[in-house]
Amino acid sequence: MNVSTSTFQTRRRRLKKVEEEENAATLQLGQEFQLKQINHQGEEEELIALNLSEARLVIKEALVERRRAFKRSQKKHKKKHLKHENANDETTAVEDEDDDLDEDDVNADDDDFMHSETREKELESIDVLLEQTTGGNNKDLKNTMQYLTNFSRFRDQETVGAVIQLLKSTGLHPFEVAQLGSLACDTADEAKTLIPSLNNKISDDELERILKELSNLETLY
């Protein structure tokens, strides 16, 4: 008896789905999930997996540092230009004072950006920062930051640090830790459905306790 091509393809899809589910349950998802990773220098290091809130803060800090570097470069160029013009001491003193004021303004802007009180204000600050550091041309980075801002559960460094400490104590795989920090699961059953590898690793009661603590730490804009 001949088996139709469509039937064969359907069976293959089912087998593939079963295989994918089994791999997800054991985190057999490729080399990038191995606990030991090789960095660009050829050195072995521990796997790092970030939840959405951590990723958001890392990128924000990188953008802030880029703006500071840009401002320092501008200041250095300005001083070099003044030196070539043989500015007198009085003028130089005034310029140095202006530089200090500019530095204070930059630090104030950075502080406001890192501690934005509302999602809307943070998105506005992101637009300004990207304009200053990338010319506003990096749409992918802008979309990434918008996504992270909209879906991050924990807003500030202190809260993210508390989340890291809480989840680190579980002894779970870094990927599982990152997923628990990103997904707003209400029950242990939901968490184990979305993160199949948690089954047989942690009891429902313990997982419920962790989910409750994560919910208490969650920041509402």
Swiss-Prot record:
Primary subcellular site in the record, as a coarse category: nucleus
Superkingdom of the organism of origin: Eukaryota
Gene Ontology MF term list: nucleotide binding; translation initiation factor binding
Region ranges (Disordered): 1-23, 71-120
Residues bearing the modification Phosphothreonine: 91-92
GO cellular component terms attached to this protein's record: cytoplasm; nucleus; P-body; RNA polymerase II, core complex; RPB4-RPB7 complex
UniProt modified residues of type N-acetylmethionine: 1
GO BP terms in the entry: DNA-templated transcription initiation; mRNA processing; nuclear-transcribed mRNA catabolic process, deadenylation-dependent decay; positive regulation of translational initiation; RNA-templated transcription; transcription by RNA polymerase II; transcription elongation by RNA polymerase II; transcription initiation at RNA polymerase II promoter
Bias (Acidic residues) ranges: 92-112
Keywords: Acetylation, Cytoplasm, DNA-directed RNA polymerase, mRNA processing, Nucleus, Phosphoprotein, Transcription
Database matches in InterPro entries: HRDC-like_sf, RNA_pol_Rpb4/RPC9_core, Rpb4-like, Rpb4/RPC9, Rpb4/RPC9_sf
Composition bias, Basic residues: 71-83
Family: Belongs to the eukaryotic RPB4 RNA polymerase subunit family.
Record note on quaternary structure: Component of the RNA polymerase II (Pol II) complex consisting of 12 subunits. RPB4 and RPB7 form a dissociable subcomplex associated with the 10-subunit Pol II core complex. In exponentially proliferating cells, only approximately 20 % of the Pol II complexes contain the RPB4-RPB7 subcomplex. In starving cells, that enter stationary phase, RPB4-RPB7 is associated with Pol II in a stoechiometric manner. The RPB4-RPB7 subcomplex probably associates with TFG1. Interacts with LSM2 and PAT1.
The protein's role, per its UniProt record: DNA-dependent RNA polymerase catalyzes the transcription of DNA into RNA using the four ribonucleoside triphosphates as substrates. Component of RNA polymerase II which synthesizes mRNA precursors and many functional non-coding RNAs. Pol II is the central component of the basal RNA polymerase II transcription machinery. It is composed of mobile elements that move relative to each other. RPB4 is part of a subcomplex with RPB7 that binds to a pocket formed by RPB1, RPB2 and RPB6 at the base of the clamp element.
Listed name of the protein: DNA-directed RNA polymerase II subunit RPB4
